[in-house]
A protein has these predicted regions:
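Short clusters of small/polar residues that mark proteolytic maturation junctions
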Residues: 71, 144, 159-160
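Short, acidic, Ser/Thr-enriched surface-loop or helix-capping motifs
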Residues: 149
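Cleft-lining beta-strand/loop regions that shape enzyme active-site pockets
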Residues: 1-135
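Conserved helicase C-terminal RecA-like lobe
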Residues: 160-166, 172-186
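Short acidic, Pro/Gly- and aromatic-enriched capping/linker segments at domain boundaries
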Residues: 136, 141-146
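Acidic-aromatic/histidine active-site loop/patch
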Residues: 156
Length: 186
């Protein structure tokens, strides 16, 4: 949606199939409509597929490392972005239900100076898990690897570093209002 002040607002509900294509199409459409800044809403986003995350980050960010995964044996895989990028001020809205790929989306945009992060502290789910079903209906999830930002920063146990910690307590979206205010300052 293009807001009256020229801000493009894009909600990303998860990083599952086609997320990157849909978000890229939304950014392109908003830019064609004259968006002067972008706000990505990843509140209540539980994460998803890493290839969707890295495709979207590659589209948004300039050349360089954007994501690192390390398996239990210590083998690292570094994902890099190409030189093409979106040069608009950006903000990312997060809350306590923003997890995994959604956290890394916000963290990498912030780390590269492309976006500010506004909202509530996140959990810091920075690892991959494999789930094994148990015979009586339960399941056990075992961590099989860890994730890092392009510079090697971990989110495990810390979550995101917020540029503005803001809670929505009433009918107004105070987090969006704070993000818009921060983008005006930039």
């Amino acid at each position: 949606a293009l807001l009256a002040d020229g801000t493009g607002l894009i909600t990303i509900q998860n990083f599952n199939s086609r997320c990157a294509d849909e978000a890229i199409a939304a950014v392109d459409a908003l830019r064609e409509q004259g968006a002067e800044r972008l706000v990505f809403d990843v509140r209540n986003n539980g994460g998803g597929f890493l290839d969707e995350l890295t495709r979207l980050l590659d589209y948004l960010l300039p050349e360089g490392p954007i994501f690192i995964s390390r398996d239990r044996a210590g083998h690292e895989e570094i994902t890099n972005s190409d030189a093409d990028c979106v040069e608009l001020p950006m903000a990312v809205l997060v809350n306590a239900d923003t997890y995994s790929a959604a956290e890394f989306f916000a963290a990498e945009l912030q780390e590269q100076g492309a976006a500010v992060i506004v909202g509530e502290p996140t959990s810091g789910k920075g690892y991959s898990q494999q789930t094994f079903p148990l015979p009586h209906g339960g399941a056990v999830a075992i961590s099989t690897g860890a994730y890092f930002t392009g510079s090697g920063a971990s989110l495990i146990g810390t979550g995101l570093t917020l540029d503005a910690e803001v809670y929505n307590t009433g009918a107004e979206d105070a987090q969006l209002a704070a993000a818009l205010e921060l983008l005006e300052i930039r």
